[in-house]
């Protein structure tokens, strides 16, 4: 079983959402970002400890070698990767970087309008744009401090 499948199965099985995974260049440090959409208060230390303990056991059983495992909440500027996330966070401010420039630009920031027919809608200061979902390299929410 590959690492992403192993992580997804374990994290979802514990009742959390797997947001993102980062690995150090040599694969010795694994950073796992989790969320609990049903929980109003977000991820806390107990959630991270629960996932960490379970993943440590799973890695031992699966004979997956690592030096350090870090579990964290996705933070206010969370990564937006999955198609469902582009719907879930509709109406929020987002930064998007595309692989292939569109209209001479690779970086966009505006209000997320959602995902429809494989295109992510974005309201910019002057107009609305549609970006191909498959062309998105990175997307992050922009935190609001009201």
UniProtKB/Swiss-Prot annotation:
Localization per Swiss-Prot or TrEMBL: Cytoplasm
Cytoplasm in keyword set: yes
Primary site of residence: cytoplasm
Signal peptide positions on this chain: none
Keyword Cytoplasm: yes
Alphabetically ordered keywords of this record: Cytoplasm, Ribosome biogenesis
Pfam families (alphabetical): DUF150_C, RimP_N
One of the GO biological process terms: translation
GO cellular component, one term: cytosol
Described purpose of this protein according to its UniProt entry: Required for maturation of 30S ribosomal subunits.
Family: Belongs to the RimP family.
PANTHER family xref list: RIBOSOME MATURATION FACTOR RIMP
Name of the protein this chain belongs to: Ribosome maturation factor RimP
